[in-house]
Swiss-Prot record:
One family name in Pfam for this protein: MCM_N
Chain ranges for the short sequence motif Arginine finger as given in the UniProt record: 666-669
Source domain of life: Eukaryota
Biased composition (Pro residues): 30-39
Family to which the UniProt record says this protein belongs: Belongs to the MCM family.
Gene3D superfamilies recorded: 2.20.28.10, mini-chromosome maintenance (MCM) complex, chain A, domain 1, Nucleic acid-binding proteins, P-loop containing nucleotide triphosphate hydrolases
Domain MCM: start-end pairs: 484-691
Keywords, sorted A to Z: ATP-binding, Cell cycle, DNA replication, DNA-binding, Helicase, Hydrolase, Metal-binding, Nucleotide-binding, Nucleus, Zinc, Zinc-finger
Protein name stated in the entry: DNA replication licensing factor mcm2
Cross-referenced InterPro entries: MCM (IPR031327), MCM2 (IPR008045), MCM_CS (IPR018525), MCM_dom (IPR001208), MCM_lid (IPR041562), MCM_N (IPR027925), MCM_OB (IPR033762), NA-bd_OB-fold (IPR012340)
Length: 830
C-alpha cells in the first residue's frame, strides 16, 4: 500500500500542467483566473483522486505497517481449500465471455438511449434537474465512436412520456390504419392522445360529408340540412353505416364511447356550421345519436364486462322524475377580487373544485357565478324489463336511465322504449351499508331513445323487422287457406278440450280491430275486451295463462292482489330527492298489449271503478300530489270472474249472477258464460283427452305405444292446428301490418240486429245493450278480416261477428227465454 502511495506521488509530480518554477507541484487552483483551463489526462485525474483519498485518511494511513500485508504467508494454502458453503455459483449470474456478442452500432445506440431515458425519469422522480450546460447536445454523440444520435423533439415534450403513436404527417395526424394498433393500456387512453383524436375527428368529418346511399345521395348532408330546418340539436347516425365505412371508428365507439362522443359532437357542430354558419346562436352543441346498434341486450344480460361500453337495451318505463338543471360549464367568482374563473367542464362523475385565484393569488372562498354558468337538462327514468321477456318465476329487473339535453320527456311511464347508451357505474353509499363491502350502482346514460311498436320494432327509419322474407311468405300462404278461421280457433289453447265459443272470443281479442281517430279529436278504440264468467273448474284461468304466453306483450294481475293504483298508476315520493314521481300500474305497463285480470269479481268496487276510463278511452288521468297528467293504456282486457255463490244460476238474469255494475259490463265486447253441465258423451271425451295429455307429457313418452292409438287427440274442433311459434308470428304480423277497411257493409242488417237486441234486452231484464255493442260488432268484423290478412271487411266477416255477438247475448239469458231468443235471432245466422 505504501509503495502504491509513493508511486502515486511520483506520477503526480510529473503532471503536464506543472510550471517550471513551481516548488512542490502546482495545482489548477494556483493558476491565474484568466489562464485557460489545462487539459487533464487520465493519469493526472487518477493521481488527484489518490491524493484526495490520502488526505481524507489522515493518520489512519500512517498506522498501517510499512511492509504492507504479506499475502504469501504460512496460511496461504487455507485460502485455496474447498468450502462447500461458499463455493456455490448461479450459472445464470456468471459473467461468461463466451455467451456475449459484440453489439453493433445501432444496438448500442438503442441501449444508450434507453439508459439516458431512465436517468431522466429517475432524476425527475427525485426532483433533481441538471443545469442546461450539462445536458447532452444532439450533435455530441454523432462525432463519437458510438454515434447514438439522440434527438430531442423540443416542440413535442409529451412524446417523452406518451406511447409512440407512430409517424405523423405535417398536420400532426395519423393514417386511419395506424390508429387501429392501440399503443396504450386501454382504448379510452389511446383515443385521448392528440394525434389519435385529430385523426378520429378528420375521419368522422369525412364520413359525414362523403357517405352516400345506393343512389349516390349524401345521407348525412341531407340530415344536417333537415336538422337546421327544424332547429334540432341531435344528428342521427346509423351504426351500420359507420361500421361499413369506418369500421375502426365503430370499434372505438363501442368500447370507449365517452371520449369518442365528445369528438363526434364537436365534429358534428363543425359540419353543421358548414351549412348554417350562424347555427351556434341557436344551439351551442350538436349531439350525435347512434341508432341501429346491432346487439340488443335485456337488462338481466348486462354484466361487468359491459361497463363503460355502448349498449342497447329495451324495456318499459315505470317511473319518471321531473326536469332538473345540471351543471355543464361552471364559472366561479372570487369573493376577494371579484374575478370570474372558468369555464370549467363539469363531468358527471367528478365534482369541479378550485383552490387558487389566478388574479389575486388567494385561496378563496369562491362562489358559483349563476349568470354565466351553462346548465343542461337532466332527467331520470326507471326502465323495467318488458313483461313478455321476464322468465317465469323471476322478478323483472330494472335500471336507472339518465336523459340529458333534448332527450328529456321523450318517454312516459308505460311506454316500451329502446335505449342506446353508455353503461356506467355510480357510487351509492346505501349499497355499501347494505352489503357491508364496496358496491357500485349501475346506470345507463342514454344517447338515443326510440319508441317500440307492439312487435318490438322501433318506430324510426332504421328499424329492422324481425320477420324474414321466408317467414312472411309462409304467413301469407297460410292466410290463403280456406279454413283459416277454424285453424286459428283450433290453435287457441290446444291443451284445453272444447270451449269453441271462448276460443273464438280469445282469437278475436288477440287479433283486435282497427283503432280510429276522427279528425284528430275523437279516438275510438280498436281493442276487444272479453269477460269470462262461469263455474269453477272450467279452465278460465288456463285460458288467461295461454294468452299470457301467446301475446307479444301481456301483464297478468289478480283481482284480490291488485288495487286501484296497482292497475292504473300511483304517485310515489322519491326517498333521495323528495320529489313526487309517477309509476304506472298493470294497465299502463300493458300499453299496446293485453292485460289479464283473474278473479275480477274479487276486486273492491272502488278499485274496479278506476278502470272505467282505461277500458273505453284507453287512458288514465292522474291528479295527485300536484301532478296532473294522462297516461296511455291502449290495451285489451281479458278478465275472468266467478258468479255469486260459486256456480252460475240459469234461472236468474246475468246481472244477478255477478257483482258487476252495468258500466263495467257495457265496456266488455264479449261476455262468455261457461257452465259446467253434465253430458255423459262430452264428459267421456273430455276424460280421454285429459288422460292423453298426461300420457304425452310424460318424459318417457313413446309415440309408438299401442295405448295411444285408442285415445283421441283432437281438441273438439274439426281443423288442423297451427304450430304455436308460427301462430305468434301470424298474430304479430296481422296486428302491425293489416288494417282492413269497411266496404259493402250491410248497414240495414246491422241496424236491425241492434234494434232487436235492445228490445229483447229490455224484455228479459238481462244486461243492457248500448251503442258500444254496435261498435263491438264492427271491431269483431275487423278482427275476422285480420285473420285472413284481408284489406277489406267482407260480408262473411260481418256474419261471423254477428254470430259471436248473438251467442254471447243468448247464453247470458235465463233458461226460460233462451230458446225463444235463439229462434228470434236465427234469421241473422243464415
Amino acid at each position: 500500500m505504501d509503495s502504491f502511495r509513493k508511486r502515486g506521488r511520483r506520477d503526480s509530480e510529473s503532471l503536464p500542467f506543472e510550471s517550471e518554477n513551481s516548488s512542490l507541484g502546482a495545482t489548477p487552483l494556483s493558476l491565474p483566473p484568466s489562464s485557460p483551463p489545462p487539459e487533464f489526462s487520465d493519469e493526472a485525474a487518477e493521481a488527484l483522486v489518490e491524493e484526495d483519498i490520502e488526505d481524507l485518511d489522515g493518520e489512519a494511513l500512517d498506522v498501517e505497517d510499512e511492509e504492507g500485508e504479506d499475502l504469501f504467508g504460512e496460511g496461504m494454502e487455507r485460502d485455496y481449500q474447498q468450502n462447500l458453503e461458499l463455493d456455490r455459483y448461479d450459472i445464470e449470474e456468471l459473467d461468461d465471455d463466451n455467451d456475449l456478442e459484440e453489439l453493433d452500432i445501432g444496438a448500442r445506440r438503442a441501449v444508450d438511449a434507453r439508459l439516458r431515458r431512465r436517468d431522466i425519469e429517475l432524476d425527475a422522480a427525485a426532483g433533481r434537474t441538471k443545469p442546461a450546460a450539462f445536458l447532452q447536445d444532439e450533435d455530441d454523440d454523432l462525432d463519437s465512436n458510438l454515434g447514438t444520435g439522440f434527438t430531442r423533439h423540443r416542440h413535442r415534450i409529451y412524446d417523452e412520456y406518451s406511447p409512440n403513436v407512430g409517424a405523423l404527417d405535417e398536420s400532426g395526424e395519423l393514417p386511419l390504419e395506424s390508429i387501429a394498433d392501440v399503443k396504450a393500456d386501454s382504448i379510452a387512453e389511446w383515443v385521448t392522445l392528440d394525434p389519435v383524436r385529430r385523426t378520429i375527428a378528420r375521419e368522422f368529418k369525412n364520413f359525414l360529408l362523403e357517405y352516400t346511399d345506393e343512389n349516390g345521395t349524401s345521407v348525412y348532408g341531407n340530415r344536417i340540412r333537415t336538422l337546421g330546418e327544424v332547429n334540432a340539436e341531435s344528428l342521427m347516425v346509423n351504426y351500420a353505416h359507420l361500421g361499413e365505412s369506418k369500421p375502426i371508428l365503430a370499434y372505438f365507439l363501442a368500447n370507449a364511447p365517452a371520449p369518442i362522443f365528445r369528438i363526434f359532437d364537436r365534429v358534428a357542430l363543425e359540419a353543421t356550421l358548414l351549412h348554417y354558419p350562424d347555427y351556434e346562436r341557436i344551439h351551442s352543441d350538436i349531439h350525435v345519436r347512434i341508432t341501429n346498434l346491432p346487439t340488443c341486450f335485456t337488462l338481466r344480460d348486462l354484466r361487468q364486462s359491459h361497463l363503460n361500453c355502448l349498449v342497447r337495451v329495451s324495456g318499459v318505463v315505470t317511473r319518471r322524475t321531473g326536469l332538473f338543471p345540471q351543471l355543464k360549464y361552471i364559472r366561479f367568482t372570487c369573493t376577494k377580487c371579484g374575478a370570474t374563473l372558468g369555464p370549467f367542464f363539469q363531468d358527471s362523475s367528478v365534482e369541479v373544485k378550485i383552490s387558487f385565484c389566478h388574479n389575486c393569488s388567494s385561496r378563496g372562498p369562491f362562489v358559483i357565478n349563476s349568470e354565466r354558468t351553462v346548465y343542461n337538462n337532466y332527467q331520470r327514468i326507471t326502465l323495467q324489463e318488458s313483461p313478455g321477456t321476464v322468465p317465469s318465476g323471476r322478478l323483472p329487473r330494472h335500471r336507472e336511465v339518465i336523459l340529458l339535453a333534448d332527450l328529456v320527456d321523450v318517454a312516459k311511464p308505460g311506454e316500451e322504449i329502446d335505449v342506446t347508451g353508455i353503461y356506467r357505474n355510480n357510487f351509492d353509499a346505501s349499497l355499501n351499508t347494505k352489503n357491508g363491502f364496496p358496491v357500485f350502482a349501475t346506470i345507463i346514460e342514454a344517447n338515443h331513445i326510440s319508441q317500440l311498436d307492439g312487435s318490438g320494432n322501433t318506430d324510426d327509419d332504421f328499424s329492422l323487422s324481425r320477420l324474414t322474407d321466408d317467414e312472411e311468405r309462409e304467413i301469407r300462404a297460410l292466410a290463403k287457406s280456406p279454413d283459416i278461421h277454424n285453424r286459428i280457433i283450433a290453435s287457441m289453447a290446444p291443451s284445453i278440450y272444447g270451449h269453441r265459443s271462448i276460443k273464438t272470443a280469445i282469437a278475436a281479442a288477440l287479433f283486435g280491430g282497427v283503432p280510429k281517430n276522427i279528425n284528430g279529436k275523437h279516438k275510438i278504440r280498436g281493442d276487444i275486451n272479453v269477460l269470462l264468467l262461469g263455474d269453477p273448474g272450467t279452465a278460465k284461468s288456463q285460458f288467461l295463462k295461454y294468452v299470457e304466453k301467446t301475446a307479444h306483450r301481456a301483464v297478468f294481475a289478480t283481482g284480490q292482489g291488485a288495487s286501484a293504483v296497482g292497475l292504473t298508476a300511483s304517485v310515489r315520493k322519491d326517498p333521495i330527492t323528495n320529489e313526487w314521481t309517477l309509476e304506472g300500474g298493470a294497465l299502463v305497463l300493458a300499453d299496446k298489449g293485453v292485460c289479464l285480470i283473474d278473479e275480477f269479481d274479487k276486486m273492491n268496487d272502488q278499485d274496479r271503478t278506476s278502470i272505467h276510463e282505461a277500458m273505453e278511452q284507453q287512458s288514465i288521468s292522474i291528479s295527485k300530489a300536484g301532478i296532473v297528467t294522462t297516461l296511455q293504456a291502449r290495451c285489451t282486457i281479458i278478465a275472468a270472474a266467478n258468479p255469486i255463490g260459486g256456480r252460475y244460476n240459469t234461472t236468474i238474469p246475468f246481472n244477478q249472477n255477478v257483482e258487476l255494475t252495468e258500466p263495467i259490463l257495457s265496456r266488455f265486447d264479449i261476455l262468455q258464460v261457461v257452465k259446467d253441465t253434465v253430458n255423459p258423451e262430452i264428459d267421456e271425451q273430455l276424460a280421454n283427452f285429459v288422460v292423453s295429455s298426461h300420457i304425452r307429457s310424460h318424459p318417457a313418452f313413446d309415440p309408438n305405444m299401442d295405448v295411444l292409438k285408442k285415445v283421441p287427440t283432437e281438441t273438439g274442433i274439426d281443423a288442423k292446428p297451427i304450430p304455436q311459434d308460427l301462430l305468434r308470428k301470424y298474430i304479430h304480423f296481422a296486428r302491425e301490418k293489416v288494417f282492413p277497411r269497411l266496404q259493402q257493409m250491410d248497414e240495414e242488417k246491422i241496424s236491425r240486429l241492434y234494434s232487436d237486441m235492445r228490445r229483447e234486452s229490455l224484455a228479459t231484464g238481462s244486461y243492457p245493450i248500448t251503442v258500444r255493442h254496435l261498435e263491438s260488432a264492427i271491431r269483431l268484423s275487423e278482427a275476422f278480416a285480420k285473420m285472413q290478412l284481408s284489406e277489406f271487411v267482407r260480408p262473411s266477416h260481418i256474419d261471423k261477428a254477428i254470430q259471436v255477438i248473438i251467442d254471447s247475448f243468448v247464453n247470458a239469458q235465463k233458461m226460460s227465454v233462451k230458446r225463444s231468443l235463439s229462434r228470434t235471432f236465427a234469421k241473422y245466422l243464415i
